[in-house]
C-alpha cells in the first residue's frame, strides 16, 4: 500500500460532499468534501506501489481542462485503470456541484 498526496490550484469551494464508486468492488472510491483556501488537495491510498507518476499525469490532464473546485479528495484505489479513475473523479465532481 502506498499513500500519495497532490495539490492543485482551485476556484470556489465545492457545493457539497460526494461519494463515487466502491473500493470493495475491486475498483476504487472517491470521497470529496468542500475545502476553503483556493486549493484542491488529493490523497490517494493505492494497492499499486510506484504509481505516483501515473496519478500525477492523470490529475494534470483532468484539471487542465477546467478550474477545479476547492475540495479535499480522498481516493481509495484497488488497482483501477486510468479510465475508471477519471470516470469516478468526474462523477464525484459533478455530484459535489449539485445542491
UniProtKB/Swiss-Prot annotation:
Main location, first listed in the record: cytoplasm
Post-translational changes noted in the entry: Covalently binds the prosthetic group of malonate decarboxylase.
Keywords: Cytoplasm, Phosphoprotein
Keyword Phosphoprotein found: yes
O-(phosphoribosyl dephospho-coenzyme A)serine: residues bearing it: 25
GO molecular function, one term: acyl carrier activity
Any single Gene Ontology cellular-component annotation: cytoplasm
InterPro entries named in the record: Mal_deCO2ase/Cit_lyase_ACP, Malonate_deCO2ase_dsu
Compartments where located: Cytoplasm
Keyword Protease carried by entry: no
HAMAP family in the cross-refs: Malonate_deCO2ase_dsu
UniProt record similarity statement: Belongs to the MdcC family.
NCBIfam families for the chain: malonate_delta (TIGR03130), PRK01220.1 (NF002293)
Role noted for this protein: Subunit of malonate decarboxylase, it is an acyl carrier protein to which acetyl and malonyl thioester residues are bound via a 2'-(5''-phosphoribosyl)-3'-dephospho-CoA prosthetic group and turn over during the catalytic mechanism.
Descriptive protein name: Malonate decarboxylase acyl carrier protein
Amino acid at each position: 500500500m502506498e499513500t500519495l498526496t497532490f495539490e492543485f490550484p482551485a476556484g470556489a469551494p465545492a457545493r457539497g460532499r460526494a461519494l463515487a464508486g466502491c473500493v470493495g468492488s475491486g475498483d476504487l472510491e472517491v470521497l470529496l468534501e468542500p475545502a476553503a483556501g483556493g486549493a484542491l488537495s488529493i490523497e490517494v491510498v493505492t494497492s499499486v506501489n510506484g504509481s505516483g507518476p501515473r496519478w500525477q499525469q492523470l490529475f494534470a490532464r483532468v484539471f487542465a481542462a477546467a478550474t477545479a473546485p476547492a475540495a479535499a479528495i480522498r481516493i481509495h484505489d484497488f488497482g483501477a485503470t486510468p479510465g475508471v479513475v477519471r470516470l469516478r473523479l468526474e462523477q464525484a465532481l459533478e455530484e459535489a456541484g449539485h445542491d
